[in-house]
């Protein structure tokens, strides 16, 4: 799986977080956030840090603080969706950086 594919998967999983929250399955939503961070985001984190450390730091905060708090404090579907949408914008930027990194690797070989 390439870095950009992992980002696409993360975005899909975050959409599911909003859906689970909307279904009042807050624990499922929170678990999905943590699993997505540990199983998917951490896998591309190294490549991203080299390109944009601040972006990685922002996303880590979103995954570990902002989104879980929006869920645990029961801020409502719109608030959770707003956090996810902000994360999606950052993930789009991360995806572009990973596409560039992949191109760079192919040019080397």
Please place each PLM-identified region on the residue numbering.
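Soluble extramembrane regions of membrane proteins in the secretory/endomembrane system
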Residues: 1-109
């Amino acid at each position: 799986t390439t870095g950009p594919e992992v980002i696409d998967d993360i975005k899909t999983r975050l959409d599911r977080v909003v859906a689970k929250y909307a279904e009042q399955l807050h624990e499922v939503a929170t678990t999905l956030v943590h699993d997505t961070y540990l199983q998917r985001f951490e896998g591309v984190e190294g490549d991203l840090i080299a390109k944009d450390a601040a972006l990685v730091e922002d996303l880590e905060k979103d995954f570990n603080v902002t989104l879980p708090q929006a869920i645990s404090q029961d801020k409502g579907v719109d608030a959770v969706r707003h956090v996810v949408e902000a994360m999606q914008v950052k993930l789009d930027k991360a995806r572009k950086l990973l596409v560039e990194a992949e191109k760079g690797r192919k040019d080397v070989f």
